[in-house]
From Swiss-Prot:
It comes from the Eukaryota. Keywords: Acetylation, LIM domain, Metal-binding, Nucleus, Phosphoprotein, Repeat, Zinc. It comes from Bos taurus. A motif (Nuclear localization signal) lies at residues 64-69. This is Cysteine and glycine-rich protein 1. The modification Phosphoserine is found at S81, S192.
Length: 193
């Protein structure tokens, strides 16, 4: 069928894609609103897309569908997964019940306003306007940094170990595989005499 309008066709809905709403991926064009994971419908971008033929996925769904089979495969360090492993017989303890407040001021207003969580890095109160959640804890935006190099993090770009958060690079260097050939990167020269 001839394309009289001259515009490219969206790889998902097959309608014309105009320049202002175009996202390109591996030679195909998409509407920004159509550039979603085929499985979970999350918005995608150049860093989160994985392509299989004509289909687009987020990296997590792509790994589950086309990656190596088995629990824990198809995801890198620091990837957040909602899979609790119940299909493998893994059981989780129930969360402890609500504990009474230790705040001596028991007014409802004081409990709502003063009962904020504490930042694991600086131990100060974290309020909603400055709260970032990562590794299951609330952090100040300014404290949400790699424990080793100080690089600012996002909830999708962190790895945690023993209650501390790291960028993926520092996590791999400090807690990744050890031994000959690891941690050198592509093109590293090894001199042996």
């Amino acid at each position: 069928m001839p394309n009289w309008g001259g515009g490219k066709k969206c790889g998902v809905c097959q309608k014309t894609v105009y320049f202002a709403e175009e996202v390109q991926c591996e030679g195909s064009s998409f509407h920004k609103s159509c550039f979603l994971c085929l499985v979970c419908k999350k918005n995608l971008d150049s860093t989160t897309v994985a392509v299989h033929g004509e289909e687009i996925y987020c990296k997590s769904c792509y790994g589950k569908k086309y990656g190596p089979k088995g629990y824990g495969y198809g995801q890198g360090a620091g990837t957040l997964s909602m899979d609790k492993g119940e299909s493998l017989g893994i059981r989780h303890e129930e969360a402890p019940g609500h504990r009474p407040t230790t705040n001596p001021n028991t007014s409802k207003f004081a409990q709502k306003v003063g009962g904020s969580e504490r930042c694991p890095r600086c131990s100060q109160a974290v309020y909603a306007a400055e709260k970032v959640i990562g590794a299951g804890k609330s952090w100040h935006k300014s404290c949400f940094r790699c424990a080793k190099c100080g690089k600012g993090l996002e909830s999708t770009t962190l790895a945690d170990k023993d209650g501390e958060i790291y960028c993926k690079g520092c996590y791999a260097k400090n807690f990744g595989p050890k031994g000959f050939g690891f941690g050198q990167g592509a093109g590293a020269l090894v001199h042996s005499e």
